[in-house]
Protein backbone atom coordinates (compact mmCIF):
# COMPACT_ATOMS: atom_id res chain seq x y z
CA UNK A 1 0.00 0.00 0.00
CA UNK A 2 1.45 3.32 -1.06
CA UNK A 3 0.68 6.48 0.83
CA UNK A 4 0.46 9.93 -0.67
CA UNK A 5 3.18 12.22 0.63
CA UNK A 6 2.95 15.97 1.20
CA UNK A 7 5.16 16.67 -1.83
CA UNK A 8 2.80 15.04 -4.33
CA UNK A 9 -0.46 16.44 -2.91
CA UNK A 10 -1.16 18.96 -5.71
CA UNK A 11 0.39 17.13 -8.67
CA UNK A 12 -1.66 16.73 -11.86
CA UNK A 13 -0.49 14.19 -14.43
CA UNK A 14 -2.36 13.94 -17.73
CA UNK A 15 -5.16 15.94 -16.10
CA UNK A 16 -5.56 13.34 -13.35
CA UNK A 17 -4.09 13.07 -9.86
CA UNK A 18 -0.35 12.51 -10.25
CA UNK A 19 2.51 12.36 -7.80
CA UNK A 20 5.25 9.92 -6.92
CA UNK A 21 5.77 6.70 -8.88
CA UNK A 22 8.61 4.22 -9.18
CA UNK A 23 9.70 1.12 -11.06
CA UNK A 24 12.82 -0.97 -11.57
CA UNK A 25 14.30 -3.60 -13.83
CA UNK A 26 17.06 -6.17 -13.37
CA UNK A 27 19.63 -6.18 -16.18
CA UNK A 28 22.18 -8.99 -16.47
CA UNK A 29 25.68 -8.01 -17.59
CA UNK A 30 28.49 -10.56 -17.80
CA UNK A 31 26.36 -13.02 -15.84
CA UNK A 32 25.79 -10.62 -12.94
CA UNK A 33 22.41 -9.02 -12.11
CA UNK A 34 22.26 -5.22 -11.81
CA UNK A 35 19.31 -2.98 -11.01
CA UNK A 36 18.04 0.05 -12.92
CA UNK A 37 15.43 2.09 -11.08
CA UNK A 38 13.36 5.19 -11.77
CA UNK A 39 11.45 7.52 -9.47
CA UNK A 40 9.19 10.25 -10.87
CA UNK A 41 7.26 13.19 -9.51
CA UNK A 42 4.64 13.58 -12.25
CA UNK A 43 2.94 16.93 -12.81
CA UNK A 44 2.66 17.22 -16.60
CA UNK A 45 0.85 16.30 -19.85
CA UNK A 46 -2.72 16.32 -21.17
CA UNK A 47 -5.53 13.85 -20.45
CA UNK A 48 -6.39 13.34 -24.12
CA UNK A 49 -2.78 12.26 -24.75
CA UNK A 50 -2.63 9.57 -22.02
CA UNK A 51 -1.75 6.15 -23.43
CA UNK A 52 -1.65 2.91 -21.44
CA UNK A 53 -0.43 -0.24 -23.20
CA UNK A 54 -0.94 1.46 -26.55
CA UNK A 55 -4.55 2.47 -25.81
CA UNK A 56 -5.63 6.13 -25.62
CA UNK A 57 -7.37 6.23 -22.21
CA UNK A 58 -9.80 9.03 -23.08
CA UNK A 59 -11.48 6.67 -25.58
CA UNK A 60 -12.34 4.25 -22.74
CA UNK A 61 -13.62 6.72 -20.18
CA UNK A 62 -16.83 8.69 -20.48
CA UNK A 63 -15.88 10.84 -17.49
CA UNK A 64 -15.17 14.42 -18.42
CA UNK A 65 -11.82 15.79 -17.32
CA UNK A 66 -11.80 19.60 -17.23
CA UNK A 67 -9.67 21.21 -19.94
CA UNK A 68 -6.18 22.08 -18.80
CA UNK A 69 -2.87 23.24 -20.23
CA UNK A 70 0.27 21.14 -20.47
CA UNK A 71 2.04 23.03 -17.73
CA UNK A 72 4.06 21.77 -14.82
CA UNK A 73 6.95 19.40 -14.95
CA UNK A 74 8.10 15.89 -14.39
CA UNK A 75 11.15 15.18 -12.31
CA UNK A 76 12.81 11.82 -12.89
CA UNK A 77 15.64 10.26 -10.90
CA UNK A 78 17.42 7.24 -12.39
CA UNK A 79 19.45 5.10 -10.00
CA UNK A 80 21.61 2.08 -10.75
CA UNK A 81 24.43 -0.05 -9.42
CA UNK A 82 25.85 -0.53 -12.93
CA UNK A 83 29.33 0.98 -13.33
CA UNK A 84 28.73 3.86 -15.75
CA UNK A 85 30.66 6.94 -16.78
CA UNK A 86 29.26 10.44 -16.46
CA UNK A 87 28.72 10.48 -20.24
CA UNK A 88 26.81 7.19 -20.12
CA UNK A 89 24.60 8.52 -17.31
CA UNK A 90 23.78 11.55 -19.49
CA UNK A 91 22.81 9.18 -22.32
CA UNK A 92 20.45 7.32 -19.96
CA UNK A 93 18.86 10.65 -18.98
CA UNK A 94 18.04 11.35 -22.62
CA UNK A 95 16.36 7.92 -22.93
CA UNK A 96 13.97 8.79 -20.11
CA UNK A 97 12.02 10.87 -22.64
CA UNK A 98 11.29 7.65 -24.56
CA UNK A 99 9.41 6.38 -21.50
CA UNK A 100 7.50 9.66 -21.22
CA UNK A 101 6.47 9.50 -24.86
CA UNK A 102 5.14 5.95 -24.35
CA UNK A 103 2.60 7.42 -21.91
CA UNK A 104 1.55 10.04 -24.45
CA UNK A 105 3.50 13.00 -23.11
CA UNK A 106 4.37 15.44 -25.86
CA UNK A 107 6.75 17.42 -23.60
CA UNK A 108 4.87 20.66 -24.31
CA UNK A 109 6.10 24.24 -24.12
CA UNK A 110 4.81 24.72 -20.56
CA UNK A 111 6.24 21.42 -19.35
CA UNK A 112 9.70 20.92 -17.90
CA UNK A 113 11.39 17.54 -18.05
CA UNK A 114 14.14 17.21 -15.46
CA UNK A 115 16.14 13.99 -15.35
CA UNK A 116 18.98 13.13 -12.97
CA UNK A 117 20.95 9.89 -12.95
CA UNK A 118 23.50 8.38 -10.62
CA UNK A 119 25.31 5.12 -10.01
CA UNK A 120 26.39 3.59 -6.73
CA UNK A 121 29.20 1.66 -8.45
CA UNK A 122 32.87 2.59 -8.17
CA UNK A 123 32.87 3.83 -4.61
CA UNK A 124 35.96 5.86 -3.97
CA UNK A 125 37.69 5.74 -0.59
CA UNK A 126 37.94 9.01 1.27
CA UNK A 127 41.62 8.32 1.93
CA UNK A 128 43.95 6.24 -0.21
CA UNK A 129 47.64 5.48 -0.23
CA UNK A 130 47.47 5.13 -4.03
CA UNK A 131 47.29 8.10 -6.38
CA UNK A 132 45.52 6.08 -9.10
CA UNK A 133 42.44 4.05 -8.32
CA UNK A 134 40.82 1.30 -10.42
CA UNK A 135 37.42 2.00 -11.90
CA UNK A 136 35.04 -0.32 -13.76
CA UNK A 137 32.95 1.00 -16.62
CA UNK A 138 30.39 -0.52 -18.95
CA UNK A 139 31.51 -0.83 -22.55
CA UNK A 140 29.29 1.31 -24.83
CA UNK A 141 28.47 -1.73 -26.98
CA UNK A 142 26.62 -3.23 -23.99
CA UNK A 143 24.44 -0.18 -23.19
CA UNK A 144 21.35 -0.93 -25.32
CA UNK A 145 19.62 -3.11 -22.68
CA UNK A 146 19.98 -0.18 -20.27
CA UNK A 147 18.26 2.18 -22.71
CA UNK A 148 15.32 -0.24 -22.88
CA UNK A 149 15.27 -0.63 -19.09
CA UNK A 150 15.20 3.15 -18.60
CA UNK A 151 12.34 3.61 -21.08
CA UNK A 152 10.32 0.83 -19.42
CA UNK A 153 11.04 2.09 -15.89
CA UNK A 154 10.06 5.68 -16.66
CA UNK A 155 6.86 4.60 -18.43
CA UNK A 156 5.91 2.32 -15.53
CA UNK A 157 6.82 4.99 -12.96
CA UNK A 158 4.44 7.50 -14.57
CA UNK A 159 1.66 4.89 -14.67
CA UNK A 160 2.45 3.95 -11.06
CA UNK A 161 2.09 7.60 -10.03
CA UNK A 162 -1.36 7.67 -11.66
CA UNK A 163 -2.57 4.30 -10.38
CA UNK A 164 -1.48 4.85 -6.76
CA UNK A 165 -2.84 8.39 -6.51
CA UNK A 166 -6.04 9.19 -4.65
CA UNK A 167 -8.63 11.73 -5.77
CA UNK A 168 -8.10 15.07 -4.03
CA UNK A 169 -9.86 18.42 -3.95
CA UNK A 170 -7.54 21.39 -3.57
CA UNK A 171 -7.84 24.71 -1.74
CA UNK A 172 -9.55 26.37 -4.70
CA UNK A 173 -12.15 23.62 -5.09
CA UNK A 174 -10.41 21.99 -8.05
CA UNK A 175 -10.63 18.18 -7.98
CA UNK A 176 -7.93 15.93 -9.43
CA UNK A 177 -9.44 12.51 -10.14
CA UNK A 178 -7.66 9.24 -9.55
CA UNK A 179 -7.13 7.05 -12.63
CA UNK A 180 -7.87 3.98 -10.50
CA UNK A 181 -11.21 5.47 -9.41
CA UNK A 182 -12.14 6.32 -13.01
CA UNK A 183 -11.31 2.79 -14.17
CA UNK A 184 -13.34 1.25 -11.30
CA UNK A 185 -16.34 3.42 -12.21
CA UNK A 186 -16.08 2.15 -15.79
CA UNK A 187 -16.33 -1.51 -14.72
Where would I find each of the regions flagged by the language model?
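Short, small-residue-biased leader/transition segments that mark boundaries at the very start
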Residues: 1-6
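A glycine-rich phosphate-binding loop feature that marks nucleotide/adenosyl-phosphate handling sites
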Residues: 7-11, 112-119, 174-182
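Conserved phosphate/anionic-ligand binding catalytic regions in large, soluble enzymes, centered on
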Residues: 10-26, 106-109, 151, 155
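Glycine-rich, flexible loop/turn motifs
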Residues: 12, 16, 46-48, 53, ...
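Glycine- and Gly-Pro-enriched alpha-helical subdomains that act as flexible
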Residues: 25, 32-90, 99-105, 122-124
Amino acid sequence: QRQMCIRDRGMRCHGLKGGIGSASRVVELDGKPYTMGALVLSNHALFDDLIVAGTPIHTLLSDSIPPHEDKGSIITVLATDIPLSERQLRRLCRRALVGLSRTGSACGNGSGEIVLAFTTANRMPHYSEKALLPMEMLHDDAINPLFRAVAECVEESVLSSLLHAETVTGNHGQTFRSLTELLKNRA
